[in-house]
Amino acid sequence: MRLFREIAANDPGPTGRMKNMKTFTTALATGVLALCPLAALADSSDPIVIPIHNWSSQIVMSNVVGQIFEEMGVAVEFVTTDSQAVYESVRLGDVTLELEVWEGAFGASFRAALEKGGIVDVGDHDAVTREDWWYPMWTKDACPGLPDWKALNDCAAVFATAETGDKGRYLDGPVDWLKHGKERVEALGMNFEVINAGSAAALWAEIGAAEADKRPVVVFNWTPNFAEAVWPGEFVEFPEWVDGCDKDPAVGPNPDALYDCGNPATGYLKKAAWEGMEAKWPDAYAVLTRISFTNPQIAEMAKLVDVDEMEPDEAAEAWLEANEDVWRPWLDG
């Protein structure tokens, strides 16, 4: 029996509102249940609570894993949560797991929760992440010194708008992603004004609007996602990330400021879980420890929603049907 309660995602972008979860095709479901011995073992009948945030890969990945759990006979519930506060929710057991712990955006919140206890590190995905200031390649024509951040600052006037006056405009991620763009601008003495996008969709809209006339833009971006295949571009190279850059002013080029360096260029993408998950849902937890996605797989998940305009649950079903050779070994152990 399936128990499912859905709370719609609040992303105003192309992800839209999530529809009711759909089951796999009968053939696929039968194959999973027949070949997966985990399905016969008893996990708790209480639902595993999976959080939904405001970017597409996380929403689709959550649906992918949720559908796998449901086909194992485990109930699943999706809830919309803040992407920073979720680690406290996992720690307290209000949310069961988190599938995309990005080092640059959420590492600090994750570490703080680990120190308090109640949350466990369930391991890394194969994916390597980067999150930072980024520009499409046509921007380099207007600012040929890129990707050096000093060259970007020298070109600030190229990025000025009516909104920012004589300062360059940088479109950062949503406020809850805590990217500290304003602190970096101040720490490095940059002639830029930081504007926060309301959603991931607003970032893609900014790039798309600039593409027609090849207007130079600099925005927050990350990898993996679909954008790298649609708009070739580069990350701005800031002073290299050093541990402590966000905590100790002595670390980094400005001895009086924090956040005076770039984000990690080879960041982790982790999974986290409530420490009680293994005892309450041992079979599902065992599968979670084996789940690992690559950069191309995560980019494809985002593309199904952001480019192909599928609903997240439909995108998850399509991804699972096309990648049975990837996820079946997670079930078989």
Swiss-Prot record:
UniProt entry tagged with the keyword Metal-binding: yes
Impact when changing W222F: Decrease in the TMAO-binding affinity
Tagged with keyword Hydrolase: no
Impact upon substituting F220A: Significant decrease in the TMAO-binding affinity
Residues at which trimethylamine N-oxide binds: W55, W102, E131, W177, W222
Disulfide bonding pattern of the chain: none
Subcellular location: Periplasm
MF (Gene Ontology): metal ion binding; transmembrane transporter activity
InterPro entries: ABC_Gly_betaine_transp_sub-bd
Major place of residence: periplasm
Annotated Ca(2+) binding sites: P249, V251, N254, A257, D260
Induction of synthesis: Expression is induced by TMAO.
Effect in UniProt of substituting W102A: Nearly complete abrogation of the TMAO-binding affinity
Activity regulation info: Binds a Ca(2+) ion, which has little effect on either the binding affinity or the secondary structure, but plays an important role in maintaining the stability of TmoX. It may modulate the protein stability in response to biological needs and environmental changes. Thermostability is dramatically decreased when Ca(2+) is removed by EDTA.
Gene Ontology CC terms: ATP-binding cassette (ABC) transporter complex; periplasmic space
UniProt keywords, alphabetically: Calcium, Metal-binding, Periplasm, Signal, Transport
Gene3D superfamilies the record matches: Dipeptide-binding Protein, Domain 3, Glycine betaine-binding periplasmic protein, domain 2, Periplasmic binding protein-like II
Residues making up the signal peptide according to the UniProt record: 1-42
Quaternary structure and partners: The complex is probably composed of two ATP-binding proteins (TmoW), two transmembrane proteins (TmoV) and a solute-binding protein (TmoX). Monomer in solution, but forms homodimers in crystals.
Functional summary from the UniProt entry: Part of the ABC transporter complex TmoXWV involved in trimethylamine N-oxide (TMAO) import. Is specific for TMAO and essential for TMAO metabolism. Binds TMAO with high affinity. In vitro, also presents a high binding affinity for choline, however this transporter seems specific for TMAO and the choline-binding affinity presented by recombinant TmoX may not make physiological sense.
Domain observations: Can alternate between open and closed states for binding TMAO.
Protein name as annotated: Trimethylamine N-oxide-binding protein
Organism: Ruegeria pomeroyi (strain ATCC 700808 / DSM 15171 / DSS-3) (Silicibacter pomeroyi)
Lineage: Bacteria, Pseudomonadati, Pseudomonadota, Alphaproteobacteria, Rhodobacterales
Gene: tmoX
